[in-house]
Curated annotation (Swiss-Prot):
Residues 1-21 are annotated as: Disordered. The gene is rpmB. This is Large ribosomal subunit protein bL28. It comes from the Bacteria. Keywords: Ribonucleoprotein, Ribosomal protein. One of its GO terms (molecular function) is structural constituent of ribosome. It comes from Sodalis glossinidius (strain morsitans). One of its GO terms (biological process) is translation. InterPro entries: Ribosomal_bL28, Ribosomal_bL28/bL31-like_sf, Ribosomal_bL28_bact-type, Ribosomal_bL28_sf.
Amino acid sequence: MSRVCQVTGKRPVSGNNRSHAMNATKRRFLPNLHSHRFWVESEKRFVTLRVSAKGMRVIDKKGIETVLADLCVRGEKY
């Protein structure tokens, strides 16, 4: 399973670790992902999504029904 938020599309980005001497070594910044079950009232079932913390805030704001409709338009399965 890839490290991508199903709602926002956040994915790992690359950057540098910086030591005290400012030496640079490559690293990855990973999104804050969680598998979370959401209750969908219209379908009377739980839906499990892999979402970031920002994705959970989007679901709180828009509602799970709207977010799932957007996923269907993009062609993603949930």
